[in-house]
Amino acid sequence: MDGVIVIRKEKGFTSHDVVAKLRGILHMKKIGHTGTLDPDAEGVLPVALGKATRLVDMITDKEKTYEAVMRLGVVTDTQDMSGTVLSQTTELSVTEEELCTVVSSFVGDYMQVPPMYSALKVNGKKLYELAREGKTVERKPRPVHFYEIEILDISFPLVRFRVTCSKGTYIRTLCHDIGEKLGCGAAMESLLRTKVGRFTLDDAITLAQTEEAVQEGTIESKILGIEEILAEYPRVCCTKEGDRLLANGNPLVQALVDAQEKNGWI
């Protein structure tokens, strides 16, 4: 099986847990997920199968959409409600107008400092491993982009919003930074990823549904083929020499592009 299966990751599973379970369900080893979701987060997790694992970087590079709930008035060490509370207040002086102004100020390019509780590595060691040892290290801000942030509901201290952003963005850090700018602190209460590139919740199935499809013999219908995944990209024909170079992992140069489809295509 070569293609992508879109899994609806449930709470309590890491992205690596999903891959491990799929290897058992599908009886195949060549599987890779296309973007980490925290254990407490849920939603769209495209998983590449077989030859489609070569496309992981292309899929991961796509913009992502989330629905999140943040709790104002609390700061935790993990920037979400699973962590240890560092400070808390029940007296919020934030108005809806102030909230909307601060939230909208994050739209566009932003230099985001990754959280200590993350899988990023420093000197070969993951940040969350250092954090669990009680260590804090300097993290360099990374450029991210927020295409849109829409507030869906305000029920202080809870605020529900939808955000579309670039890859590598931490939504719990966004919540933390919003709280910091408001002066009251904030932490992420829940997170649902609703879209990764072209893949949406409507495309997603749970691990249990995947196992059921295998048992019923309908699993092939749940997998998007490589050609379908690449349909959004321009189709370029190349010469036989170009075919040979591509097959060996070499880049294609303009001189090896041919308008005649009979010689192959990529």
Question: Can you annotate each of these PLM segments?
Answer:
Residues 57-72, 137-151:
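Structural signature of FAD isoalloxazine-binding scaffolds in flavoprotein oxidoreductases
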Residues 24-28, 42, 46, 137-168, ...:
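The conserved catalytic core of RNA pseudouridine synthases
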Residues 58-111:
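Acidic, low-complexity central loop/insert segments
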Residues 1-10, 14-37, 41-44, 59-62, ...:
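Accessory RNA 3′-end/elbow-binding domains used by RNA modification enzymes
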Residues 47, 68, 124, 174, ...:
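Residue-level signal for inorganic ion chemistry
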